[in-house]
Structures are given as structure tokens and as C-alpha cells.
């Protein structure tokens, strides 16, 4: 049976080869005019410089944690941790590298060939990120399992993935939103120049941010969820069904890669049809393949359909959360239209209505996650919950592709604007970008849902490791109550840190843009050249400086509670952070997405269009929502997963401290 697990690394390699072929396809396309190439080079170099600087800092963090895991747990687990960190880094770097090539080629295709070709290039660029995530994730999990056969060592691989993911999400989120807020407030509100105008000194930093935040950061987030779901399913499967239960999640993930590759061939645009339909078709085809395959595999491996039903619950919940997110964040539905209407009376009512929509949007996804948990548990117990997480994430390859398509299309529009291409080109890139905003919002909803199930599955694995099933978590125990309070507080405190980081960085950016408008002659007339480099440097330095405290907090908090208060209190912390974290992430991501699309709805000519008072109010709402949806909200996903993985990996250490009762 264990030899069947060889299928996992083989399909991982297939995914990487497919990513390479897509990368080669993108690179062969025409990159457009000299001006387009020049702007694309600015974006590419800025993104590369940020990642290299970020990785230099991460080397120190990873080295310290490597030594801690080696001495505290085992050196084999430490090596797996190092492998997880390395694979997550490589996935982010490769995906972002291709995205910064695909953006200018998408703009060139829109200029020369029209919508269909532009969609194909943008999606292919995103698919490279998707295939790198699943390919390296499954390759790593497969290798570690085949070499060691130990789920405890495998949890080290998950810890490595989680560590990189947090810094990539937080650092990338701070970078992109510092630039975005600075560019919007000074450019649109104060000066009245359009988005992506080459006269705006922050516009290159804004476009760089799309790549480091929404491509590399998002990819690292889902890489962590993907790996974490597989690890938790293997851990619980080994306990429930021995070797069969451990190998099954690896094979399911392998089938998911094949399904994602098949789905990419169904993403075909039409000059007159909506690109959104093409992207949805690919996702639904992949999901259908996984459903059919899971029914067959469940019958063959277990002699029944219990595992398949759990997987299907996860898949369906993931798809439905994406649809619900679209309802709350798309300009086609009443919630966004209501915010746009409120913008007519000023920025205060815009912000109030957006907050209300964000809070409202938590209800249905939480109920869906709850139904998924109940259904998965009834189908196959605790193992079923872990399989539901694997099922939801089985099509990650195409989910990430659709999500990463968004920032590529956004960059293409920016390059078209800065290069002075005809309005017809911008019309095509605007259509692609509008779809990208919706898919990005849906992707964030999916990421939150998958984070909730993954964190829950990892929590169950932790409970198994410290024998909480024997004693239970006593809600009348004062230590557990303290753990719940601390856990419930952490997502709020973490969000405060990241929001404040964006605010401080945006302040510096705004001051720099204002300084350039004052001191560089002819900049607003188009005769003077802005200093793009200084704005890129501000975002880079701010992101690198501000990402450290939130990152360290996510590791220290569970370690401190586990050692001081014991394993039951740590269980309370994980439960508290899971509940408030999922709610905060949904609220912030959906409120931010709704504000963003309310602004775009007005820019289409509604409520006075661009330059109107309603538009100015909507820009303020969008600016408030930027760190909500692209920094704090997505980072909470990683916080709740990373703390659970830290608890799982260091469970043996906590058990040694006063027999798991803690020092206090």
C-alpha cells in the first residue's frame, strides 16, 4: 500500500513540468513596445528586489526555528521543516517571476489580438503559480512520508510552509497597500489624476505590490493550507485506518492535480462572452473530476463511500463560499450597489455601509462551514473532517491560477495606461481586471473557508497528540478559560499590528508623493519624470521592518501558553483564535472587496461617475478597505493555521512540562 504513495511525488513532478511548459508559452509571447518593456522591467525588478530582501531576513528566522525544532523535537523533523520553508519560497518566487512577465504580454495581446489571447496569457501566468503550489506541496509531502513514514516528521514540513506563508502574506500585504493607499489618496483624491497614471510616483510601487502581495503572498497562503490539510489527514488517517488512511489523502491530492490540469484546458475565452464564465468553467470541471474520482477511490480503498461523502462536503462548501463571496463583493449584486448609493452622501456613510456589509457577510459562510463539519463528521468521523479540508483544497492548482490571474490582469491595465496605449486596449484590460477583482474576492473567501477546515483538522491532530480526547477540554477549568480569551484576542491584536503597519507606511508614501509633486518641475504636466525608485524603496523598507513582530507573535503565543498553562489551555487558545479569526477574516476581506467594487461600479458611470462627489467618497471607502482585504484579513488565515501547527509540532515539549499541566 505504501508504494502507492509514490504516485504523489510523481504527480507533483508532472505539475511542475506543466508549470514549466506554461511558463515557456508565456515567455514566447510578444512583450509589446519599448515603453511597455521599460515599465514591465521596473515592475519586475522591484518585485525581485523585495523578495530577495525578504528572503534574506527569513533565512535568520528559519535558522533559529530550525535549531529550536532540532534540539526540542528531532533533527529529522527540523530537516522536514527546512524543506517545507524552501519549497514554499521556491513556489512563491517562481510564480511571481512568471506573473511579472505575463502582465506586459497580456497588455500586448490586448493591443494586437484582443480579449481571447489576453485572457489566455493572463490565466497561463496565474496557472504557473497554481501548479508550483500543488506540485511542490505534494512532492514535499510525498518525499517526507515515503522516507520517514512518520506523521510527526511530516508536521515539520507543514511548519516550514506556515512560517514562510505568514511573512509572505504580511510583508506582501503591507508593501502593496502602502503603495496603493498612497497612490490613491494623493493621485485620485488630491490631484484628480486617474489610476495608474505615469505621473504618479507611487504607481510602479503599486503594481509591484500586486505581485508580491496578491501572487507570491496568496500562493504561500494556499500552499500552507494545502500542505496542512494533507498532513492532518495523514495524521488522523494513520490512527483511524492505519496505512490505508494515511496514503489515501496523498492519492486524493494527486488526483486533484490531474483534475486541475484538465480544468485549465477548459478555460477558453470568447471575444463577446464574459471571461468570468471561462474561468468558472475550468474550476467546475476540475471539481467534477475530483468528485467522480473520490467516489471510485473511496469504494476501492475502504469498501464504502464514507470518505467520498466527506470529500464532497468539503468541495461543495468551498464552491458555495466562493459564490456567496461574489454575492457580497460583486457590483452585479445589491450589497455593493447599496454602498455605491450611500457614497452620494459622503465618505462616512460609505464606510458605515461597507462595515455593515462585511459583518453581514460572515453569517452564510460560517453556516456553510458548520454544515460541512457536521456532514464530514457524520460521514467518516474526525478523519472525515480532515478529508473535507483535503477535498476543498484538492483543486488548489486551478483555484490559485484563477486567483493569480487577477493581479496579472490588473498589472496589464496599469502598463497599458502608463504606456499611453489606445482606449480600446484599456477597455479590454478593464474587462479582464473587473473579472480579476471578483475572482480575487472569491479566492479570499475560499482561502478563509479552507483555512478554517485546515486549522480545525490540525487542531484535532493536536488534540490526538496530547491526548485531549481522553480528558476533554473542561470549559470550567480556569486555565482553559484564560486560553480561550487569549486566543479570541489574538486575531484582533494581530490585525491591529498589520493595519497600523500599513498606516505608518502609507503616511511615508503620501509624504513622498506630495514632495515630488511640489519639487519636481513639470511632473503634473507630463514633462517632468517622477522618481519611482524612492517609492519602491519606501514600501520595501516598511514591509520588511513591520512584518517581524506579527510573525514572531504567531510562534511565541502558542509556545508561551503551552509551557505556562499546559496543553488544555493551549487547546482553548487554538479554539478561541479559530472562531474569532475566521469571523474577522471574512468580515475584513468581504468589506474590503465590497468597497473596492462599489468604487468601480461608480467609475462605470453610475451615481455621477469618475470625479463626482460619490466617486471621491467611494475612493475613501476603497482606501479603508485596502488593508482590510489585502493585508489583515488574509493574514489572519495564516495566523490561525500557524499557531495550530506550532502546537502540533511542539506537543511533545508541552507534555514534558509538568505532565502537560504547565508551569503555573
Regions from the PLM with identified roles:
Residues 1-664:
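Hydrophobic packing and interface segments
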Amino acid at each position: 500500500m505504501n508504494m502507492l504513495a509514490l504516485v504523489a511525488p510523481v504527480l507533483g513532478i508532472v505539475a511542475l513540468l506543466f508549470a514549466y511548459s506554461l511558463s515557456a508559452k508565456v515567455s514566447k509571447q510578444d512583450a509589446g513596445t519599448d515603453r511597455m518593456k521599460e515599465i514591465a522591467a521596473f515592475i519586475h525588478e522591484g518585485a525581485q528586489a523585495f523578495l530577495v530582501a525578504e528572503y534574506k531576513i527569513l533565512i535568520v528566522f528559519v535558522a533559529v526555528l530550525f535549531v529550536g525544532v532540532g534540539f526540542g523535537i528531532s533533527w529529522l523533523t527540523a530537516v522536514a521543516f527546512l524543506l517545507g520553508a524552501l519549497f514554499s519560497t521556491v513556489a512563491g518566487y517562481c510564480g511571481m517571476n512568471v506573473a511579472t512577465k505575463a502582465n506586459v504580454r497580456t497588455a500586448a495581446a490586448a493591443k494586437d489580438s484582443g480579449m481571447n489571447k489576453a485572457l489566455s496569457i493572463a490565466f497561463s501566468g496565474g496557472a504557473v503559480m497554481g501548479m508550483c503550489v500543488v506540485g511542490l506541496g505534494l512532492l514535499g509531502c510525498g518525499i517526507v512520508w515515503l522516507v520517514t513514514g512518520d506523521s510527526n516528521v511530516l508536521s515539520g514540513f507543514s511548519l516550514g510552509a506556515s512560517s514562510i506563508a505568514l511573512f509572505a502574506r504580511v510583508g506582501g500585504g503591507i508593501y502593496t497597500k502602502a503603495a496603493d493607499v498612497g497612490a490613491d489618496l494623493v493621485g485620485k483624491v488630491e490631484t484628480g489624476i486617474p489610476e495608474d497614471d505615469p505621473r504618479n510616483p507611487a504607481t510602479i510601487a503599486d503594481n509591484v505590490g500586486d505581485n508580491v502581495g496578491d501572487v507570491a503572498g496568496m500562493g504561500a497562503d494556499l500552499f500552507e493550507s494545502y500542505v496542512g490539510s494533507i498532513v492532518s489527514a495523514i495524521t488522523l488517517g494513520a490512527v483511524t485506518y492505519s496505512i490505508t488512511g494515511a496514503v489515501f489523502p496523498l492519492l486524493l491530492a494527486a488526483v486533484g492535480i490531474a483534475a486541475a490540469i484538465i480544468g485549465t484546458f477548459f478555460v477558453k475565452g470568447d471575444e463577446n462572452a464574459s471571461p468570468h464564465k471561462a474561468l468558472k468553467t475550468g474550476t467546475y470541471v476540475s471539481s467534477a473530476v475530483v468528485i467522480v474520482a473520490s467516489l471510485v477511490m473511496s469504494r476501492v480503498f475502504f469498501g464504502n463511500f464514507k470518505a467520498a461523502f466527506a470529500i464532497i462536503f468539503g468541495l461543495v462548501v468551498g464552491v458555495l463560499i466562493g459564490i456567496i463571496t461574489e454575492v457580497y463583493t460583486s457590483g452585479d449584486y445589491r450589497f455593493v450597489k447599496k454602498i455605491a448609493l450611500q457614497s452620494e452622501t459622503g465618505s462616512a456613510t460609505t464606510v458605515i455601509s461597507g462595515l455593515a456589509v462585511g459583518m453581514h457577510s460572515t453569517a452564510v459562510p460560517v453556516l456553510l462551514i458548520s454544515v460541512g463539519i457536521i456532514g464530514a463528521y457524520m460521514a467518516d468521523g474526525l478523519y472525515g473532517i480532515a478529508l473535507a479540508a483535503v477535498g476543498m483544497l484538492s483543486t488548489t492548482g486551478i483555484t490559485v491560477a484563477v486567483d493569480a490571474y487577477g493581479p496579472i490582469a490588473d498589472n496589464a491595465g496599469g502598463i497599458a495606461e502608463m504606456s499611453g496605449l489606445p482606449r480600446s486596449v484599456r477597455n479590454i484590460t478593464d474587462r479582464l481586471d473587473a473579472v480579476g477583482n471578483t475572482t480575487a474576492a472569491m479566492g479570499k473567501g475560499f482561502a478563509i473557508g479552507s483555512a478554517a477546515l485546515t486549522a480545525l483538522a490540525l487542531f484535532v491532530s493536536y488534540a490526538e497528540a496530547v491526548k485531549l480526547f481522553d480528558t476533554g477540554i473542561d470549559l470550567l477549568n480556569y486555565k482553559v478559560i484564560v486560553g480561550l480569551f487569549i486566543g479570541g484576542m489574538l486575531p484582533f491584536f494581530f490585525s491591529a499590528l498589520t493595519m497600523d503597519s500599513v498606516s505608518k507606511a502609507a503616511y511615508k508614501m503620501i509624504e513622498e508623493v506630495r514632495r515630488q509633486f511640489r519639487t519636481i518641475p513639470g511632473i503634473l504636466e507630463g514633462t517632468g519624470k517622477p522618481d519611482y525608485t524612492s517609492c519602491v524603496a519606501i514600501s520595501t523598507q516598511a514591509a520588511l521592518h513591520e512584518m517581524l513582530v506579527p510573525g514572531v507573535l504567531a510562534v511565541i503565543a502558542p509556545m508561551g501558553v503551552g509551557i505556562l498553562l499546559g496543553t488544555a489551555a493551549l487547546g482553548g487558545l487554538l479554539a478561541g483564535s479559530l472562531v474569532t479569526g475566521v469571523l474577522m477574516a471574512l468580515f475584513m476581506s468581504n468589506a474590503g472587496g465590497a468597497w473596492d467594487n462599489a468604487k468601480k461600479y461608480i467609475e462605470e458611470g453610475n451615481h455621477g461617475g469618475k470625479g463626482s462627489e460619490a466617486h471621491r467618497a467611494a475612493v475613501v471607502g476603497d482606501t479603508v478597505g485596502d488593508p482590510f482585504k489585502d493585508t489583515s484579513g488574509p493574514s489572519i488565515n495564516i495566523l490561525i493555521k500557524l499557531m495550530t501547527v506550532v502546537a502540533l509540532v511542539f506537543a511533545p515539549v508541552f507534555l514534558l512540562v509538568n505532565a502537560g499541566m504547565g508551569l503555573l
